[in-house]
A protein has these predicted regions:
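Terminal, non-catalytic protein-protein interaction segments that mediate quaternary/complex assembly
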Residues: 1-330
Length: 330
């Protein structure tokens, strides 16, 4: 996908060396934006293998989000991608689906005079009776059907009181549906974007979500827009990271098409052997040397969104290059 390749190039060309909480250094840039036309096929990257277990994990994760579960006990039956952030009982400090489907609403006694809040017709009470919540997914679906031209089809996973202390607050924190010329578009805001590991998943996941919602509201899909606040590429630790800090201007050569030369120089000159693949730059350069193939398509069963199961979503005509390995910074 050309848009993804350009993201890599622009980050290497314009990015800054930046430390972060993980201890693995990054090349980072601020406020990167791009669009993908969903009418041109499903945006699953073709310059590396993303079917098999990767596709399965992405679909199971999205369906888990839509379930509204705050734990990973059911998700663990199909993928382990959230295991590192859960406690021994499978509970998460922050779960996207919990806020998508059960965003807390203050009880009336806690509301300030003059404020406007949803009424009992719009919210639900938790089975424990301890709190009220609004189902944001159902709200936007109903709102798109009733008032498609509204600019308020917003879903957020960010709760400040949770995010302030969470081990991993939401990275892709808010998305907005917008209807133009009868087509359903989706815009995602992402505060932190791991270009090698996370972004390919995020593109596919929100494209699939857009298809699911579009089917629910009986509209064709339009465009996926993506805003990356901190778009970054991990470049290793210790001496290897220091080498990138001292040679960051060399990375700009990628914009001039000197990809093979730059890749060879890094492999020869950067300290360490990168056995843990925490330096993502060499394999991203390898990916840039590959030509994108025609995008695949998807088929979705004719079911309500809350009844969709994994087997109801089929990936079709997917051509791809070989796998590339990238370490995950936790």
């Amino acid at each position: 996908m050309d848009e993804y390749h350009q993201l890599i190039i622009d980050t290497l060309k314009n990015g800054n060396f930046k430390e972060n909480r993980t201890g693995v250094s990054t090349i980072s840039q601020f406020n990167y934006n791009y669009e993908v036309d969903l009418q041109e096929g499903f945006p699953l990257l073709t310059t590396k293998k993303m079917d098999g277990s990767r596709w399965e994990s992405m679909v199971h994760e999205l369906l888990w989000y839509l379930s509204g579960e705050h734990h990973i006990r059911n998700l663990q039956e199909n993928t382990s991608i959230w295991d590192a952030w859960a406690d021994e009982d499978g509970n998460l400090e922050t779960a996207y689906g919990r806020f998508w489907r059960r965003y807390p609403v203050p009880k009336q006694r806690n509301q300030i005079e003059g404020e406007s809040w949803v009424t009992e017709e719009d919210y639900r009470e938790d089975i424990s009776g301890d709190f009220y919540f609004i189902d944001q997914i159902q709200y936007v679906i109903d709102n798109i059907k009733e008032n498609p031209n509204s600019r308020r089809h917003v879903v957020t996973a960010w709760h400040p009181a949770n995010a302030a202390i969470s081990k991993l607050p939401p990275c892709h924190l808010m998305f907005i549906f917008n209807v133009q010329n009868g087509k359903l578009n989706c815009h995602l805001t992402q505060r932190s974007a791991d270009i090698a590991v996370g972004v390919p998943f995020n593109i596919a996941s929100y494209a699939l979500l857009t298809h699911l919602v579009a089917k629910e509201v009986d509209m064709p899909v339009g465009t996926f827009g993506h805003s990356l606040v901190d778009a970054h590429i991990y470049c290793g630790q210790d001496e290897r990271a220091e080498w990138y800090k001292e040679n960051i201007n060399r990375l700009g050569e990628v914009a001039w098409g000197n990809i093979s030369v730059l890749k060879d120089d890094i492999e020869e000159q950067a300290p360490g052997n990168n056995e843990d693949n925490m330096d993502h730059i060499p394999n991203l350069l390898e990916q840039l040397l590959r030509l994108p193939k025609e995008r695949p398509t998807i088929e979705i069963a004719d079911k309500p969104i809350d009844d969709i199961q994994f087997e109801d979503i089929q990936l079709k005509d997917y051509q791809h290059e070989d796998s590339l390995r990238f370490g995950v910074a936790e």
